[in-house]
Amino acid sequence: MIFLLIFSAVLFVLYAYVGLRFVMPMDIQLGYKYLICFALFIFYCFPILGIILYFNKIENNLSTLIHWLGYTGLGFVSLLFFIQAGADLLLLLKSLFAKGHSFDPHRRAFLGLSAKTIVGSIAGLGSIWGMYNATKEPVIKRVEIKIDGLPESLKGFRMAQITDLHVGSMITGKFVKTVTRKIKELNADMLFFTGDAADGSVQSYGKHLQSLAEIHPKYGKYFVTGNHEYYSDMNGWLQLIEGLGFKILVNESQNIIVNDATIMITGIPDRGGGHFSSFHKTNMEKAVGGMNPSDLKILLAHQPKDVEHALKYGFDLQLSGHTHGGQYF
């Protein structure tokens, strides 16, 4: 409830600012301004309604439409907000430092409307580009990791990582099947899934992950929870993911023998997991306790902020998700 109130308040500021500073100064008839502001209010309501539906586990075609409308609109308005705020800041600086001069009010009105048309077009195109990037076929990013003292038998060892699939009303099985195909083509020795598998219930969206069962790396596949695993039927999702062949690491480690070398894979729950289950509270002592010396130590942690644990316990590599590659929305 508190989250919903805070979210609604922040959104209200965002949409109200766009209405007051972008829409109302337009040189158009007042009735059109009110109509645009009314549309803004409707789109303001969609994300809030989407969250209410999400937490009440109402998942159907109508809820999917509301999610698409709400978050597409939010992306568009957020871009407008930042562009308009930047323009207002420049105008403020100009008013403070520039000397006053006469101007043609008709010319100013024309330039103002032209500027808003350009800004609106940029925000619209940016939103379309963002939605395209969010739903297009995923791109494999290849990274060569250099680790000092790595045994010869581990050089060339291939690991694949997926994270933050967020299957649900917007990301479906079609997308996951593409991910599965690309991973199989890599023929990786090991697969890691660093959390946030889904948004919603297992009953509605569990089917979208089924293709991941087709991936069979030689040295196994491993999963750690993200924050979204705890928002809807945590146990149900973990049971499904385990059924797909993943070893779920909850404050535990696995020693994997590769030729004559040993890889230690340690997995910890999301940093917020302890708020939902005492068993899912991060416990590094438990996670690394009793493990034998290894040639390569890998930490799986959903949030990059857990790097403090990687440093403290001498891990060679940390794999995380959560940030969506720096995507702000």
Regions found by a protein language model. Give the residues of each.
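Soluble catalytic domains of enzymes that build or remodel membrane lipids, polysaccharides, and related
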Residues: 141-142, 146-329
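Non-catalytic terminal accessory segments
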Residues: 1-135
